[in-house]
Swiss-Prot record:
Keywords: Activator, Biological rhythms, DNA-binding, Nucleus, Repressor, Transcription, Transcription regulation
Transmembrane segments: none
Superkingdom, taxonomy of origin: Eukaryota
Protein name per Swiss-Prot or TrEMBL: Cyclic AMP-dependent transcription factor ATF-4
CDD domains the record matches: bZIP_ATF4 (cd14692)
GO biological process, one term: regulation of synaptic plasticity
Record's signal peptide: none
Chain intervals for the UniProt region annotation (Leucine-zipper): 294-322
């Protein structure tokens, strides 16, 4: 059985098409029954449906793939809360040791083979043309950074991911080492781990992917097909109790506070001015009354003084009159005595 290098490269380096839809199985009932009978391999069918038409005989070779019987394959049972019904073939461990990789590489050497692994990767990328219109899920922007110079895999192993709501941040550049994890960002949450010996496919449910997308705000990952999730992220129109005030509304508020606080000050000042004015008026009235009373007393005293002065004058005249009278009487008495 021969496998073209272009097909294997498309599976390794291209956007990974094996996404699980938690709303329903990827296979119909006829395909599931054929899987149970062991007469048809869904892996070969899915691989052939996603293989690029690179050369003329590549599709025929890929359609003629026959994997080992299902009784020889190592099947791992899913956990109790498996959300992928009908996807048991994804947990099967496929052994590729029986494939003659040298002959596969030699089958693609009919054309001018690239001289370096980078040229080979560029050739494989240029020949890939996937038809994603037939997929059950909506088209999403898939990005898989290419920075690995690894040999062809000898073993394909798929494991279900434990329910951990975390998505690794998108790597800047994948270093060239023996084991590198390359995350694939799409709604089904498939993460690939490439190594020289095997390929590990890790699947997460869509609900956990949405939760991880909510928690991982720094990575900038967003899910387009979740209206409920988008409605939760919409900002509430109700103002928060400790939110910062709007800068446009703050000047009006400040002016309002200023006028409301200035009005009592002006009223208090006016009230104080009126109090001072009334106090001054009362003081002037009091002083006027006191002055008038003093003037009246002075006038009365002056009147009494005039009366007393007049009495004194009259008394002084009477006294003078009496003196004169006494003098005349003495003189008259002396005249009589002399006679």
């Amino acid at each position: 059985m021969s496998l073209c290098v272009g097909d294997a490269g498309a599976l390794l380096l291209g956007p990974w098409p094996l996404t699980a839809d938690p709303q329903g199985p990827l296979l119909d009932q006829d395909e599931e029954s054929s899987v149970l009978e062991g007469s048809w391999s869904p892996s070969s069918s899915s691989l052939s449906s996603f293989s690029p038409p690179a050369s003329g005989d590549a599709p025929s070779e890929l359609l003629s793939l026959s994997w080992q019987p299902s009784d020889v394959l190592l099947t791992e049972q899913s956990t109790a809360g498996d959300v992928f019904p009908g996807m048991d073939w994804m947990t099967e461990k496929l052994d590729l040791n029986d494939f003659d990789l040298d002959s596969l590489i030699g089958s693609c050497d009919s054309e001018d083979s690239p001289g370096s692994p980078e040229d080979l990767l560029a050739c494989l990328d240029s020949s890939m043309d996937l038809d994603l219109d037939s997929l059950p899920f909506g088209s999403a922007d898939l990005d898989l950074p290419l920075g690995l110079d690894l040999p062809l895999p000898e073993e394909i192993k798929s494991e279900p991911l434990s329910p951990a709501p975390s998505v690794p941040s998108p790597p800047e550049e994948a270093p060239q080492d023996e084991h590198t994890e390359v995350p694939v960002l799409h709604p089904a949450g498939i993460m690939l781990s490439l190594s020289p010996s095997h390929i590990v496919v890790l699947l997460t449910p869509k609900e956990e992917q949405n939760i991880s997308d909510c928690s991982d705000s720094d990575s900038g990952i967003s899910v387009s097909g979740s209206p409920a999730h988008q409605s939760d992220l919409e900002p509430s129109s109700r103002a928060k109790p400790y939110s910062r005030p709007d800068p446009e509304a703050s000047p009006a508020l400040k002016g309002r506070v200023k006028t409301s606080s200035g009005a009592p000050k002006v009223e208090k000042k006016l009230k104080k001015m009126e109090q001072n004015k009334t106090a001054a008026t009362r003081y002037r009235q009091k002083k006027r009354v006191e002055q008038e009373s003093l003037n009246s007393e002075c006038s009365e005293l002056e009147k009494k003084n005039r009366e007393l002065s007049e009495k004194a004058d009259s008394l002084s005249r009477e006294i003078q009159y009496l003196r004169d009278l006494l003098e005349e009487m003495r003189t008259a008495k002396q005249r009589k005595s002399k006679r």
